[in-house]
């Protein structure tokens, strides 16, 4: 039930060509989750690929600060994205859902830091 509410406000994407998701130093308007495919991350003059099954823009979303990296979805990436303002509203109205969703984001962050 609760997860359906989050998916209801999500937009599905299926990229046909590289698509910018976040730009370092700017506050992202969307949070992304890559289900299949990859994204190219550029940070501190380094580039690397992440995905599938990763969030993009989660740190900026959690701490309400600009993105720490520029990220492009590669062609053929599939997933969902949420407008951050809509997601924030939904989670503010559903505290238990917010705890669970923030837990997913934190788990994703921890796994990235461990690599």
Predicted features and spans:
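A cross-family signal for key residues in well-ordered alpha-helices
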Residues: 4-7, 107, 111
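Cyclic-nucleotide recognition modules
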Residues: 47-106, 110
């Amino acid at each position: 039930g609760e997860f359906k509410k989050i998916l209801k406000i999500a937009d599905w994407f299926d990229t046909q060509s590289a698509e910018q998701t976040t730009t370092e130093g700017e506050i992202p308007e969307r949070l992304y989750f890559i289900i299949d495919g990859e994204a190219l991350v550029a940070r501190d003059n380094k580039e690397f690929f992440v995905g599938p099954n990763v969030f993009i823009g989660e740190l900026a979303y959690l701490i309400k600060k600009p993105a720490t990296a520029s990220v492009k979805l590669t062609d053929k990436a599939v997933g969902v994205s949420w407008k951050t303002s809509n997601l924030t509203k939904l989670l503010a109205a559903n505290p238990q859902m917010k705890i669970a969703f923030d837990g997913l984001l934190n788990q994703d962050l921890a796994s990235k830091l461990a690599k």
